[in-house]
Amino acid sequence: MDFLNSSDQNLTSEELLHRMPSKILVSLTLSGLALMTTTINSLVIAAIIVTRKLHHPANYLICSLAVTDFLVAVLVMPFSIVYIVRESWIMGQVLCDIWLSVDIICCTCSILHLSAIALDRYRAITDAVEYARKRTPKQAGIMITIVWIISVFISMPPLFWRHQGTSRDDECIIKHDHIVSTIYSTFGAFYIPLVLILILYYKIYKAAKTLYHKRQASRIAKEELNGQVLLESGEKSIKMVSTTYVPEKSLSDPSTDFDKIHNTVKSPRCKLRHEKSWRRQKISGTRERKAATTLGLILGAFVICWLPFFVKELVVNVCEKCKISEEMANFLAWLGYLNSLINPLIYTIFNEDFKKAFQKLVRCQY
């Protein structure tokens, strides 16, 4: 069969020749994204499987997310590329039904995995002691199973409604002619998980911030107490040497180097304690900023990738007069698919164990 679809038959040779470079460029770009998504998610899955240090219930959720995103890259993206380049569906309605089913289920499952990971992290930081006992591989398996079951229940009704209307043989889309079906699918697959993720990560950030401040206050109090004990026990050994005469006005002179003057109130030990305290406060602040950055990247990537698509789905299918070009619809769909490439990067790039595991895999040292 000719590479160009039937709609191209009415075009002149010059028009076909003019459109060919853009189609090749689109095909290569999307194929590159699909290949990158497949490779990166494969690395995450392999790293968790072969690295014993990564055999942790929290990482099982990340592994399941990587499997879901891998399926998007292997089973969804290639068919979408062919559909976009040819501008018509040529693989029959049976394969269309299978493709749409896998597309909706996997994308919904990927989004729900993000909710499950957020819930897991929230419980781990707010109920650390009790949840550490409950956080077992079995519990992670139950969460993963529930996520897949919910994804299927959310995805099936839109596919059912699709067969209630008439579909052309050269198209493979879901027309949400029923407002109930549109609201059910969009809210179940995105809007409700979005609200849940926003609430959970806000609470995680607040809890982490409070925890950092409590630890910081506890360390400072402990160091102050240790400093007092050191002063009392070492009072006799501290020499108050005054070999240099310093006038009173020099105390306010910024050029005076107080570190070299021996007749100061603080002992070297107290100064060392103060410096350690300051360094720990700095480390605590750095960790807090790192946590905020990580959460910001997770939420930002999720919202940027999926919000435009689901806004389009809701508006276009509820508002009869609202139309969108096929090119824009394809762009928004692939913007959502892009989240499957970003997910493994965000959830592993800040983890040193994952970095080391990736290096071993690349060097074949596993």
From Swiss-Prot:
Positions bearing carbohydrate: 5, 10
Gene3D superfamilies membership: Rhodopsin 7-helix transmembrane proteins
UniProt keyword terms in alphabetical order: Cell membrane, Disulfide bond, G-protein coupled receptor, Glycoprotein, Membrane, Receptor, Transducer, Transmembrane, Transmembrane helix
Residue sites binding serotonin per the record: 103, 107
Transmembrane segments: 25-49, 60-81, 97-119, 140-159, 179-202, 292-315, 328-350
Membrane topology value: Multi-pass membrane protein
PROSITE patterns from the UniProt entry: G_PROTEIN_RECEP_F1_1, G_PROTEIN_RECEP_F1_2
Pfam families attached to this UniProt entry: 7tm_1 (PF00001)
GO cellular-component term (any): plasma membrane
A GO BP annotation: positive regulation of MAPK cascade
SUPFAM superfamilies: Family A G protein-coupled receptor-like (SSF81321)
Disulphide connectivity of cysteines: 96-172
Membrane topology (Cytoplasmic): 50-59, 120-139, 203-291, 351-366
Extracellular topological segments: 1-24, 82-96, 160-178, 316-327
Primary location class: membrane
Motif (NPxxY motif): 343-347
Subcellular location: Cell membrane
Family: Belongs to the G-protein coupled receptor 1 family.
Family matches, as PANTHER family: 5-HYDROXYTRYPTAMINE RECEPTOR 1D (PTHR24248:SF196), ADRENERGIC RECEPTOR-RELATED G-PROTEIN COUPLED RECEPTOR (PTHR24248)
Stated role: G-protein coupled receptor for 5-hydroxytryptamine (serotonin). Also functions as a receptor for various alkaloids and psychoactive substances. Ligand binding causes a conformation change that triggers signaling via guanine nucleotide-binding proteins (G proteins) and modulates the activity of downstream effectors, such as adenylate cyclase. HTR1F is coupled to G(i)/G(o) G alpha proteins and mediates inhibitory neurotransmission by inhibiting adenylate cyclase activity.
UniProt protein name: 5-hydroxytryptamine receptor 1F
Species the sequence originates in: Cavia porcellus
